[in-house]
Amino acid sequence: MAMATQASLFTPALSAPKSSAPWKQSLASFSPKQLKSTVSAPRPIRAMAEEAATKEAEAPVGFTPPQLDPNTPSPIFGGSTGGLLRKAQVEEFYVITWESPKEQIFEMPTGGAAIMREGANLLKLARKEQCLALGTRLRSKYKINYRFYRVFPNGEVQYLHPKDGVYPEKVNAGRQGVGQNFRSIGKNKSPIEVKFTGKQVYDL
């Protein structure tokens, strides 16, 4: 009787609510009551800030951000991506997608190796930097273009990269440079000339 009681404590509930998006299924088992017993009330400060930044920095004119298909299969990987962390339940996580011309082995940004499927692939990761690391590897070694998105706990999807449809290392006639200074560092003003002025040598 005691062993049956212990087994019931570690048996997951079978009546988890179904969702149309696969990333919601992993979060559906965490009800608000369970979160109260382990962590304090969620503070979606970063999510609110990201939503505000999204409204300000919209996609360039003439570029339509691609839509994320949640039914895209994931690569074949026998290990673990380290989990989506607790922040995926109260803030966000990231999804990277790409299309492979054939089934081939690639290195995971979290360690280990996986097999990408022929055609579309979708991989969920905890951090944006992991998506950038994997995307750089895909473009440099496999010559594969990629896209990644931010997914909020409420199911909202935000397209992140490449923002205007062109990768940063490529020339884009419509892209505005930020912090550009068309001179060598040797042509900067002497630091003593800008001392106590509140300016930097690269500002002049």
UniProtKB/Swiss-Prot annotation:
Which cellular component, as a GO term, is one annotated location?
A: photosystem I reaction center
Keyword Ribosomal protein annotated: no
- Name where it's found: Plastid, Chloroplast thylakoid membrane
Main site of residence?
A: plastid
Show the transit peptide stretch: 1-48
Q: Name one Pfam family in it.
A: PsaD
SUPFAM superfamilies given in the database record: Photosystem I subunit PsaD
- Write the record's keywords in alphabetical order, separated by commas: Chloroplast, Membrane, Photosynthesis, Photosystem I, Plastid, Thylakoid, Transit peptide
Please report the record's description of how this protein sits within the membrane.
Peripheral membrane protein
Among the GO biological process terms of this entry, one is: photosynthesis
Write out the similarity annotation. Belongs to the PsaD family.
Job description of the protein: PsaD can form complexes with ferredoxin and ferredoxin-oxidoreductase in photosystem I (PS I) reaction center. PSAD may encode the ferredoxin-docking protein.
Q: Give the protein's recorded name.
A: Photosystem I reaction center subunit II, chloroplastic
Its gene is psaD
